[in-house]
UniProtKB/Swiss-Prot annotation:
Name used for this protein in its record: Ribosome-binding factor A
Example GO molecular function: ribosomal small subunit binding
GO BP of this protein: maturation of SSU-rRNA; ribosome biogenesis
Lineage per the UniProt record: Bacteria, Pseudomonadati, Pseudomonadota, Gammaproteobacteria, Enterobacterales
This protein's UniProt keywords: Cytoplasm, Ribosome biogenesis
Gene: rbfA
Naturally occurring in which organism (per UniProt): Salmonella typhimurium (strain LT2 / SGSC1412 / ATCC 700720)
A GO cellular component entry from the record: cytosol
Quaternary structure annotation from Swiss-Prot or TrEMBL: Monomer. Binds 30S ribosomal subunits, but not 50S ribosomal subunits or 70S ribosomes.
Length: 133
């Protein structure tokens, strides 16, 4: 029977929690004025590298998102040192931050579906209204 949760997945899950706490309590960069959420962490099999996926509250401005990712990338050494103190790992992985737009895309798709359903309901209730124009 194969392991459902291997060590990289367990470490990634714990690392996601720890990075979220660090970003909330320790990072005071003004470029991260918006609230930052860690949406996921992917670890390499040897635990030497970690991809950290983040989302930002008020992420409408693309320049602010780029500045936020750059600020996180520049603070990755500091975050890594705090991770080393918080987690018992022989090697603290090298962190790379990425913007996760899946939440934004999911909301956009949900809005599209809602609009289509609403439009379909309107046409079903008033089928003759569209022919009168």
């Amino acid at each position: 029977m194969a392991k459902e949760f291997g060590r990289p997945q367990r470490v990634a899950q714990e690392m996601q929690k720890e990075i979220a706490i660090i970003l909330q309590r320790e990072i005071k960069d003004p470029r991260l004025g918006m609230m930052t959420t860690v949406s996921g962490v992917e670890m390499s099999r040897d635990l030497a590298y970690a991809k950290v996926f983040v989302t930002f509250l008020n992420d409408k401005d693309e320049d602010a998102v780029k500045a936020g990712i750059k600020a996180l990338q520049e603070a990755s050494g500091f975050i890594r040192s705090l991770l080393g103190k918080a987690m018992r790992l022989r090697i603290v992985p090298e962190l790379t931050f990425f913007y996760d737009n899946s939440l934004v895309e999911g909301m956009r798709m949900s809005n599209l579906v809602t609009n289509v359903v609403k439009h379909d309901e309107e046409r079903r209730v008033n089928p003759d209204d569209s022919k009168e124009d």
